[in-house]
């Protein structure tokens, strides 16, 4: 980790992989190899042993936290003498491009939905709240896509606050990684889930990170439990390049893909292109905006080579 170890020692309890795996207790494995195949991201090699060692203990921890919040809600209901609208428990997952946030989110969604106390678990990504492509071009932000200023933060905060207020139905824009843009006239509908997982680059950001809007609410103000998926930048860059090369022969080959022109690149040229994108966009965004929020997370999942978790840090 790039932050001094003494900071982590002060803020977190550290668990090596085997120590963390021992906290699973009797939580059953509810995913099959076929289930896991559907949840894996591009170029990720997550196995059932990874689910057993890392994600089952985490699902147990989250279940305990959700249960504690539900009990506090019952006590408040008794005190107030009425039952307020159902408010979901909100989990955020942050981290760099290519670190595997989406896979982590999907696995947790699948595992948490098997707990009888909270069977309805929804998942959204903040990608849908990126400004439309035309608006990014108008604002001169196309080369800063993924940076905080490229998101419609007002709409994102309004969405998450409506969820937290217990509104019956709330909609979120849907993003296409093929067209590199929002899908017009399509929405994801959230209808009072027990748990909402929100995954994105900047979901740990606070007013301290915004020199302009220091007083307005941020997504992090509405989150009950936050997770940061971490890895050394050299690994992140390698994973990004590997994923780019996979997309070149996969998603980029579609004529509808915004990046279709990349599908015609040879290996050497494609590698150089991906490396340049990392060095000019994703790397600086990580350094300036994403990594500085890491120590705000309740839990840090530290990855080593091959996307395998080797350490878990739990906030004291």
Curated annotation (Swiss-Prot):
Localization terms from the record: Cytoplasm
Entry EC number(s): 2.7.1.33
One example of a Gene Ontology biological process annotation: coenzyme A biosynthetic process
Major enzyme class: transferase
Alphabetical UniProt keywords: ATP-binding, Coenzyme A biosynthesis, Cytoplasm, Kinase, Nucleotide-binding, Transferase
Molecular function terms from GO: ATP binding; pantothenate kinase activity
The protein's annotated pathway: Cofactor biosynthesis; coenzyme A biosynthesis; CoA from (R)-pantothenate: step 1/5
Binding residues annotated for ATP, in chain numbering: 95-102
Entries under SUPFAM superfamilies matching the protein: P-loop containing nucleoside triphosphate hydrolases
Matches recorded under InterPro entries: P-loop_NTPase, PanK, PRK/URK
Cellular component terms per the entry's GO annotation: cytoplasm
Catalysed reaction, written as an equation: (R)-pantothenate + ATP = (R)-4'-phosphopantothenate + ADP + H(+)
Key word Methyltransferase present: no
SS bonds (residue pairs): none
NCBIfam families linked: panK_bact
Family: Belongs to the prokaryotic pantothenate kinase family.
PANTHER family in alphabetical order: URIDINE KINASE
Descriptive protein name: Pantothenate kinase
Species of the source: Shewanella halifaxensis (strain HAW-EB4)
């Amino acid at each position: 980790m790039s932050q001094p170890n003494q900071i982590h020692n002060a803020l977190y309890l550290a668990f090596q992989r085997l120590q963390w795996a021992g906290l699973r207790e009797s939580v059953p494995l509810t995913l099959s190899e076929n289930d896991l195949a559907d949840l894996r991201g591009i170029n990720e090699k997550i196995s059932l042993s990874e689910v057993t060692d890392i994600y089952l203990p985490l699902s147990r921890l989250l279940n305990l936290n959700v249960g504690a919040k539900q009990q506090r809600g019952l006590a408040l209901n008794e005190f107030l003498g009425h039952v307020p609208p159902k408010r979901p428990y909100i989990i955020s997952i942050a981290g760099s491009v290519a670190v595997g946030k989406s896979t982590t989110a999907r696995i947790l969604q699948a595992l948490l939905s098997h707990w009888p106390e909270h069977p309805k678990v929804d998942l959204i990504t903040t990608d849908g709240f990126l400004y439309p492509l035309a608006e990014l071009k108008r604002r001169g932000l196309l080369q800063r896509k993924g940076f905080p200023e490229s998101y419609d933060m007002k709409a994102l905060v309004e969405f998450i606050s409506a969820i937290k207020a217990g509104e019956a139905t709330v909609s979120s824009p849907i993003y296409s990684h093929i067209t590199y843009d929002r899908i017009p006239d399509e929405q994801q509908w959230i209808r009072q889930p027990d748990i909402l997982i929100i995954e994105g680059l900047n979901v740990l950001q606070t007013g301290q990170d915004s020199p302009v809007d220091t007083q307005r609410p941020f997504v992090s103000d509405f989150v009950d439990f936050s997770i940061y998926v971490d890895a050394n930048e050299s690994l992140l860059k390698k994973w990004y390049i590997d994923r780019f090369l996979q997309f070149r022969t996969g998603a980029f080959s579609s004529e509808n893909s915004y990046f279709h022109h990349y599908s015609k690149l040879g290996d050497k040229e494609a590698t150089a292109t991906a490396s340049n994108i990392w060095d000019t966009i994703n790397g600086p965004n990580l350094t300036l905006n994403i990594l500085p929020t890491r120590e705000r997370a309740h839990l840090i999942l530290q990855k080593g080579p091959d996307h395998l978790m080797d350490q878990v840090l739990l906030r004291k």
